[in-house]
Amino acid sequence: MSMNDINSLSQTKWNCKYHIVFAPKYRRKVFYREKRRAIGKILRQLCEWKGVTIIAAEACPDHIHLFVEIPPKISVSGFMGYLKGKSAAMMYEQFGDLKYKYRNKEFWCRGYYVDTVGKNESRIAEYIDNQLKEDEMGEQLVIPSASPFTGRK
């Protein structure tokens, strides 16, 4: 960790970095094309408004990875409540068809995964950068379904 990694607030020095993963309700694969671009733009905007720095991020079809630096004046749970609540409202505003897929405007799953980032910063950034490729490889390993009666597709 270098001195460049340390931030300051009035009389506080801090280096609070987190790897956060969260998914849409029912883990639906919704982040393709324009919805993928839209969620990226929305999350960048919301993070900027809160003073949160995005170090690395990836929108996979059925989940989001964020590697962020959150100031200590903001709790992770408070930030995630804000991020998921506002982003859901903004997605519903842009894409009216989502209302029919998700009841009661519950776009995101209730929970999320969070881990502190210590000395593994470069590894986590690399992991997030390669996450989309890993998901695609996993999907390619799926055996195509065949008819149980004829053996053909």
Named regions from a protein language model:
Residues M1-K153:
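Basic nucleic-acid-binding interfaces
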